[in-house]
């Protein structure tokens, strides 16, 4: 699964829906993709965000950086969709690449970027 910023924030607030999804992912050895741009939106005080810190330390959690290749893909996706949210576009790019569903609290923006994404709304 690929997480956007919303579920990362919800995890930090101990949202049961997000906790359960992550527990299931762990039980089934499913990778958890965290786009770096989504992490940047969610992280504010790493020393106080213990739940988020634990997620990031899990062996199956992968933080995907916004490198040159992804930045180019993000720019193309934003141009094609007529939208402007870099983090959402990066989430879409990461989910496409990993062929995973996206866990989100804001499905409308992601659907505008890519209507083919498999979204799980929390």
Please annotate each region the language model reported.
Residues 108-116:
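Short loop/helix-cap segments at secondary-structure boundaries that form the rim of catalytic
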Residues 42, 85-101:
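Acidic, metal-associated active-site segment
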Residues 7-8, 38, 70, 90-91, ...:
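Alpha-helix capping/helix-boundary segments
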Residues 1-34, 43-59, 120:
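Short, well-structured N-terminal submotif of metal-dependent ribonuclease cores
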Residues 47, 105-109:
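Short, polar loop motifs at secondary-structure junctions
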Residues 61, 115-122:
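Active-site regions of enzymes building and remodeling cell-envelope glycoconjugates
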Residues 60-81:
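Acidic catalytic patch
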């Amino acid at each position: 699964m690929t997480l956007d910023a919303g579920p990362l924030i919800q995890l930090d607030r101990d949202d049961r829906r997000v906790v359960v999804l992550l527990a299931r992912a762990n039980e089934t050895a499913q990778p958890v993709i965290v786009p770096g741009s989504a992490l940047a939106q969610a992280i504010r005080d790493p020393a106080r965000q213990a739940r988020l810190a634990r997620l990031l330390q899990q062996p199956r959690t992968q933080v995907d950086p916004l490198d040159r290749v992804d930045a180019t893909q993000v720019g193309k996706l934003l141009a094609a969709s007529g939208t402007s949210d870099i983090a959402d576009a990066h989430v879409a790019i990461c989910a496409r690449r990993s062929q995973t569903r996206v866990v989100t609290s804001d499905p409308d923006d992601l659907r505008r970027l890519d209507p083919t994404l498999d979204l799980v709304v929390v």
